[in-house]
Regions:
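N-terminal glycine-rich phosphate-binding loop for ADP-containing cofactors
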Residues: 1-434
Length: 434
C-alpha cells in the first residue's frame, strides 16, 4: 500500500496532532491537518513537529480547516478521524466527508472504544469496506502499539494492506483485535486502574490514593503507579472508558469497572487530573520555582501532602531489583504476609488472569495481551509476570494460595492457566527499582 497523502480530521487534539507527526515522519506523507480554524491548525502543526523531534517534517504538515475538506480528502490515500469520543460528533464528521471519499481511500478512526461496526454504518456500503479502527496509544512516538479493528464489512485485502503499512512503514506493533468495548489494551489496563481506584476508597482510612499507589508502583512492572496513570490520562477519559465497558460487557470482572463516587465528584468539580492541575493528585508550584505533589484525601475531601509510605516488602523488593536479583525480589513479596503485600500480589495475579481471559476472547493469539500491555502501556505483560514468578507451575500454586476465595469462585484457575507459553518479552526490563 502506497500512502502518499493523509488527511487527519481533529488534528488539534492530542492524538490527532501526534499521529500527524507519525504519518509525516515515519511515513514521509503529505499530511493535511484539518481543524475548525486556521489558528488551531497552525498551532497543531508546530506541536506535531515537536512531538517527533524532527523539524524537517514541517514541510509535510499542512494546516487546513473544514472548509478545505473537498481538496484534502479528494487527494488523500488515507483519511484518519480523530475527533472527540462522542458518537454524534463522529457521525456529523462522517456526513461531511463521505461525499469526498475516493474509491481507493482508506478511512480510519482513532476511537479508543466505540463500536467499529456502529461507526461504519454511518457510511454507504461501498465506503464501509475501507473503514476500520486504527487505535494508537499516546504518545505514539514512544508507544508503538496500534490496535487495528475491522468491522463486519471491512475488506480483508484492504485490512491486511493497512496492517502491513502500519508495521513496515510507520513501525507500529500491530495487534488485530475484535470489535469489543475498549478493545484490548484499555480493557485490561483500566480494569487494573479502576480496581486500584476502588481499593483507594476501600482503604481510605489507611491513606487511600497514595497508599494504594505505593503498594503497586513501578517496582511491580509499570512505568508509573496506576492512579498516577489515571491522573495523566484524565479522570473524565477514565470514566468514559470504564462506563463503556461496564455498560457493554458482563464478564467476571464486571463490577471492577464501576468508578467510585469520590472520583465522580472530582470530575463534577472539573478536577480531572494533570490537564486541569488537580485530580487524584495536585501539582503545587512553590515560591522558589520548585514543584510539590499533593494528593486528594478521600476522607477529608481536601488535598494534603503526599505521604512517603515505608512498607518492608517494598524496601526488600527494590533492594533486590537494584542488583538484579529478580527471583529473590519475588520471593520477598510471596513470603510477606502483610496487608500491603497481600494487596500487591493479588493485584498482580488478577492482572495476569484478566489479561489471559481477554486475549483468548478478543485477541489474535495468546500473545496479544502481552503485545498490547508492553507496547501500549509500558507495563510488564501478563505472561511475563508468570515468568517472573518462576514459571507456570510456580505461578499457578501462588495464584491459588494467595487469591481470595471470592475471586477463585469466579474463575477456573487451572483451565485459564492451561498450556500457556512463555512470554516473548523479558520481564526484567519492566520491573523498576523504585
Amino acid at each position: 500500500m502506497n500512502i502518499k497523502t493523509v488527511t487527519i480530521i481533529g488534528a488539534n487534539g492530542t492524538m490527532g496532532c501526534n499521529i500527524s507527526g507519525i504519518f509525516a515522519s515515519f511515513g514521509n506523507a503529505k499530511v493535511y491537518m484539518v481543524c475548525r480554524n486556521m489558528e488551531s491548525a497552525e498551532k497543531a502543526q508546530i506541536k506535531a513537529t515537536m512531538s517527533v523531534k524532527a523539524e524537517a517534517i514541517g514541510k509535510n504538515l499542512i494546516p487546513k480547516t473544514y472548509d478545505d475538506l473537498e481538496e484534502c480528502i479528494g487527494a488523500s490515500d488515507l483519511v484518519f478521524e480523530s475527533v472527540r469520543e462522542d458518537i454524534d460528533i463522529k457521525k456529523s464528521v462522517y456526513e461531511k466527508i463521505a461525499k469526498y471519499i475516493q474509491p481507493h481511500t482508506v478511512i480510519g478512526t482513532g476511537t479508543s472504544g466505540l463500536s467499529i461496526n456502529d461507526l461504519s454504518e454511518y457510511f454507504d456500503e461501498n465506503i464501509r469496506q475501507h473503514f476500520m479502527g486504527i487505535h494508537m496509544f499516546n504518545p505514539p512516538y514512544n508507544m508503538t502499539l496500534c490496535e487495528v479493528t475491522p468491522s463486519d464489512y471491512t475488506n480483508t485485502d484492504y485490512l491486511n494492506e493497512v496492517k502491513m503499512y502500519l508495521k513496515s512503514v510507520l513501525h507500529r506493533n500491530v495487534v488485530e483485535v475484535k470489535d469489543e468495548p475498549a478493545f484490548m489494551g484499555n480493557r485490561i489496563g483500566f480494569q487494573f486502574i479502576n480496581e486500584a481506584l476502588q481499593y483507594a476508597e476501600l482503604y481510605k482510612d489507611n491513606g487511600g490514593i497514595d497508599y494504594i499507589d505505593s503498594i503497586i508502583g513501578p517496582f511491580t512492572g509499570r512505568s508509573m503507579a496506576p492512579l498516577v496513570t489515571s491522573d495523566f490520562v484524565g479522570l473524565d477519559v477514565h470514566k468514559a472508558i470504564v462506563d463503556n465497558i461496564y455498560k457493554n460487557t458482563n464478564d467476571y470482572a464486571h463490577e471492577t469497572f464501576v468508578m467510585p463516587e469520590f472520583a465522580i465528584e472530582l470530575i463534577a468539580a472539573n478536577k480531572l487530573g494533570r490537564k486541569t492541575g488537580a485530580g487524584l493528585y495536585q501539582t503545587i508550584l512553590n515560591t522558589d520555582g520548585s514543584k510539590s505533589i499533593n494528593v486528594y484525601d478521600i476522607v477529608t475531601k481536601t488535598y494534603r501532602a503526599k505521604e512517603k509510605y515505608v512498607f518492608p516488602f517494598v524496601k526488600q523488593m527494590i533492594k533486590e531489583l537494584k542488583v538484579g536479583n529478580y527471583a529473590s525480589a519475588f520471593n520477598k513479596l510471596n513470603n510477606n504476609h502483610s496487608t500491603e503485600a497481600t494487596i500487591c500480589i493479588q493485584f498482580l495475579i488478577k492482572y495476569v488472569i484478566y489479561g489471559i481471559v481477554t486475549t483468548k476472547s478478543i485477541g489474535e493469539n495468546i500473545h496479544s495481551a502481552d503485545d498490547v500491555m508492553a507496547t501500549g502501556f509500558n507495563w510488564v505483560p501478563p505472561l511475563a509476570v508468570i515468568d517472573a514468578f518462576g514459571g507456570l507451575e510456580a505461578f499457578r500454586q501462588i495464584a491459588i494460595e494467595k487469591s481470595s476465595k471470592e475471586f477463585l469462585s469466579f474463575i477456573d484457575m487451572n483451565e485459564i492457566l492451561k498450556d500457556l507459553p512463555k512470554s516473548k518479552y523479558d520481564y526484567r526490563s519492566f520491573f523498576k527499582a523504585k
